[in-house]
């Protein structure tokens, strides 16, 4: 009975299907390897280099002098509320007190809200649900920048810049 199945058309069809699937998977893997990874990082200068004049590497005293008194402060993080629509967290290295990350949140659309053009110098393609996101690493500058915008009429936009690990 087993011999009949092996010599049958079913067995040949099964083997042919396995070969086709194997070739297809190999082709997909090769195509993905050969494709240039979009937004994986570039060697160009980042467009978004500071927030309200504050840069990564600054010490806490410089930040507070530039941005004013934070709503909440600690050795590791300052939290600022500039308005109902704009909030910012500045993160510090506990040992050096230098800025390691800046994260800004905007609530709602309209004037004063940061755009992808201001962050990356170009528009970001929207996803099917209307949201947008992008992360770019800048190894020469020593940090990465991300932009995230939720879908809808009252979006939340988050922009973060953070030092790359050394």
Residue ranges: model-predicted function:
Residues 1-11:
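N-terminal secretory signal peptides that target proteins for export/translocation
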Residues 8-9, 23-25, 75, 159:
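Compositionally biased regions
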Residues 14-26:
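Bacterial N-terminal signal peptides
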Residues 24, 48-50:
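A generic, residue-level signal for flexible/boundary positions that often mark functional hotspots
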Residues 29-33:
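Boundary at the C-terminal end of the N-terminal hydrophobic targeting segment
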Residues 36-44, 48, 55-166:
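A cross-family detector of function-defining hotspots
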């Amino acid at each position: 009975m087993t011999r009949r199945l092996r010599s049958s058309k079913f067995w040949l069809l099964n083997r042919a299907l396995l070969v086709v699937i194997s070739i297809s998977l190999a082709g997909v893997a090769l195509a993905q390897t050969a494709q240039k990874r979009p937004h994986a990082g570039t060697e160009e200068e980042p467009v978004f280099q500071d927030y309200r004049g504050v840069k990564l590497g600054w010490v806490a005293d410089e930040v507070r002098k530039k941005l004013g008194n934070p709503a909440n402060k600690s050795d590791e993080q300052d939290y600022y509320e500039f308005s109902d629509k704009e909030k910012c967290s500045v993160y510090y290295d506990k040992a050096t007190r230098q800025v390691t990350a800046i994260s800004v949140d905007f609530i709602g659309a309209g004037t004063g809200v940061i755009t992808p053009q201001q962050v990356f110098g170009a528009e970001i393609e929207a996803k099917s649900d209307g949201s947008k996101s992008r992360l770019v690493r800048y190894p020469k500058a020593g940090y990465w920048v991300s932009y995230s915008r939720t879908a809808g009429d009252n979006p939340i936009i988050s922009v973060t810049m953070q030092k790359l690990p050394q």
